Amino acid sequence: MCTGGCARCLGGTLIPLAFFGFLANILLFFPGGKVIDDNDHLSQEIWFFGGILGSGVLMIFPALVFLGLKNNDCCGCCGNEGCGKRFAMFTSTIFAVVGFLGAGYSFIISAISINKGPKCLMANSTWGYPFHDGDYLNDEALWNKCREPLNVVPWNLTLFSILLVVGGIQMVLCAIQVVNGLLGTLCGDCQCCGCCGGDGPV
C-alpha cells in the first residue's frame, strides 16, 4: 500500500474512534445514566473534556487531512501546482503529531480518573473521592463506599476505560502516520510514478 492509501486508511479508522471518544465523554456527564442535580458532584476529570477535545475534536482535523491525501494529485494539491505530494505528506505528519498529542491528553486524563475513582456521596454524607490509588479496581466490595449516584463506579470505570483504549489506539495510528508521512515526504508516493512528466515517485 502506498503512503497516500495508507493515510486514507488511517483517517477512515480515526473518524469512528473520534465519535466513540466524543460520545463516551458526553455520557460521563450523566453518572449512572441519570441527570445529576449539582455539577459540582461530577468527577473533576470529566470537565477536562479528554474525550471531547483530545480524542474528539483534535482528532477530526488529522483524520480529514489523512482522508484527503489520496485525492491530491501528484503535481499539486489544493489547486496550487507548486504544492506537491511530498509537501502534502509532510503536512500530514504535522497533523499526525497534533492528533497524537490530543489522544495522549485523553489517554492520560482517563488513566488518572480510573486510578482516582469517581466522585460520589460517601457514608459521612459528603461528596468526595473514597478510593485511593486504584484500590477499588481489585476489590468490588469497596464500590459500596459510593452511595450516590447509583452505579456510578461501573459507569465511570467503563466509560473512562473506553476513552483509555480509544486514546491508545489513536496514539498508535497517529504514530504510524508520522512514519508514513515522513516516508512519503522523503520517498514520494508510489502512485505518482511516471506522472507530471517524471519517471519516478513525486
Curated annotation (Swiss-Prot):
Tissues expressed in: Jejunum and liver.
Cytoplasmic face residues: 1-9, 67-93, 180-202
Keywords in alphabetical order: Glycoprotein, Membrane, Transmembrane, Transmembrane helix
Domain of life assignment: Eukaryota
Extracellular side: 31-45, 115-158
Keyword Glycoprotein: yes
PTM section of the record: N-glycosylated. Glycosylation is required for the growth inhibitory effect.
Function description: Regulates the adhesive and proliferative status of intestinal epithelial cells. Can mediate density-dependent cell proliferation.
Name the record gives this protein: Transmembrane 4 L6 family member 4
Lineage: Eukaryota, Metazoa, Chordata, Craniata, Vertebrata
